[in-house]
């Protein structure tokens, strides 16, 4: 930029028959240099300003969310305080626009304390969305939530601190197995191994050269998909120890069927007093659950225990027969 300005100045002076003094060029060079420096500094700082503005706006959204949640009087779910949570006529859309597609439609659920409940259905049927809504990750505009006979004015947000959600996709960090399990919290080795036993991973960890102190590469690329899921599941189960309701979003989808069955049996035995709701893909787990909700296109099309669904729902029978046939051909 500096040389362009100087060249233009000299060119037009000579063209018009003027005289170009060396001192004038030197002074002009100094001024143009300063202006250029200011221009580049502004461009650099402007980028930072945009980033900072974005960060401030995002933090305001988060702060507002915490403020709103802080205004909610948390309703603690003590052991003797509740018997059933009822969900009535719940609708939900990821889009706020009026008339947008509904991802959950007219959902009715009855969740009894201590029950083990399964959500089944094809991918995209609404299982994961329902779990996220129950955790309070999304606001509800339509639908009533009752704790026994008491209507919850702030829906699931009222009780969200009593609910833990363990997602399907495991998050792994570039640190040790132990740190991935505890996330820096103080946990004694006995407790850690208790949860490794629960997810059938103790033997695998003990076979590693440094056991709990073995390193995990970023994103867990040195672990199998099943190992990553079981580490994440053990971490989530440990963190959910004081929660009343546990939501599981296909946390063992990458684990082999035999291990998966044993893991669910272990979880249900250890957390027999907790209400556990799990979306599942492999139907061989269904007999472990008290109640099953069958999702399709954002709706619940059937519910009941395994025998009831098999008797009353043709779609469930077809799904079950298809699953059994697929399992027999893969053996």
Where are these regions (language model features)?
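A hydrophobic transmembrane-helix motif
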Residues: 1-33
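Cytosolic ends of transmembrane helices, especially the final helix of ABC transmembrane type-1 domains
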Residues: 34-62, 72
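ABC ATPase nucleotide-binding domain helical subdomain, centered on the C-loop/LSGGQ "ABC signature"
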Residues: 61, 146-149, 178-218, 240, ...
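Primarily ABC-family ATPase nucleotide-binding module
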Residues: 63-115, 146, 151-156, 269-272
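The feature captures the beta-strand-to-loop junction immediately N-terminal to the Walker
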Residues: 120-122
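Catalytic Walker B motif of ABC-type/P-loop ATPase nucleotide-binding domains
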Residues: 246-250
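C-terminal portion of ABC ATPase nucleotide-binding domains
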Residues: 265, 273, 282, 287-331
């Amino acid at each position: 930029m500096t040389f362009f300005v100087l060249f233009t100045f000299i060119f037009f002076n000579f063209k018009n028959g003027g005289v170009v003094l060396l001192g004038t060029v030197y002074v002009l060079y100094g001024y143009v240099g300063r202006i250029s420096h200011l221009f580049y500094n502004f461009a650099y700082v402007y980028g930072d300003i945009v980033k900072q503005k974005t960060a401030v706006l995002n933090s305001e959204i988060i702060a507002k969310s915490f403020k709103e949640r802080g205004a909610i009087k948390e309703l603690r779910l003590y052991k003797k305080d509740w018997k059933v949570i009822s969900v009535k006529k719940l609708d939900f859309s990821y889009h706020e626009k009026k008339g947008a597609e509904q991802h959950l439609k007219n959902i009715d659920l009855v969740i009894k304390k201590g029950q083990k409940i399964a959500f089944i259905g094809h991918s995209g049927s609404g299982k994961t969305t329902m779990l996220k809504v129950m955790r309070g990750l999304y606001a509800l505009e339509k639908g009533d939530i009752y704790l026994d006979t008491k209507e919850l004015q702030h829906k699931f947000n009222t009780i969200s601190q009593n609910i833990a959600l363990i997602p399907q996709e495991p998050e792994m960090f570039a640190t040790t197995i132990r740190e991935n399990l505890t996330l820096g919290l103080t946990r004694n080795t006995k407790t850690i191994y208790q949860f490794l036993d629960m997810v059938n991973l103790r033997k695998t960890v003990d076979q590693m050269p440094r056991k709990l102190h073995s390193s995990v590469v970023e994103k867990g690329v040195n672990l199998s998909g099943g190992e990553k899921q079981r580490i994440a599941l053990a971490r989530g189960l440990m963190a959910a120890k004081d929660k009343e309701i546990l939501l599981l979003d296909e946390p063992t989808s990458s684990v082999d069927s035999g291990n998966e069955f044993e893991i669910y049996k272990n979880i249900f035995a250890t957390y027999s007093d907790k209400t556990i709701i799990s979306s599942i893909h492999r139907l061989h787990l269904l007999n472990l659950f008290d109640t099953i909700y069958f999702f399709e296109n954002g709706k619940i099309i059937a519910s009941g225990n395994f025998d009831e669904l098999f008797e009353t729902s043709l779609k469930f029978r077809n799904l079950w027969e298809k699953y059994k046939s697929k399992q027999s051909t893969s053996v």
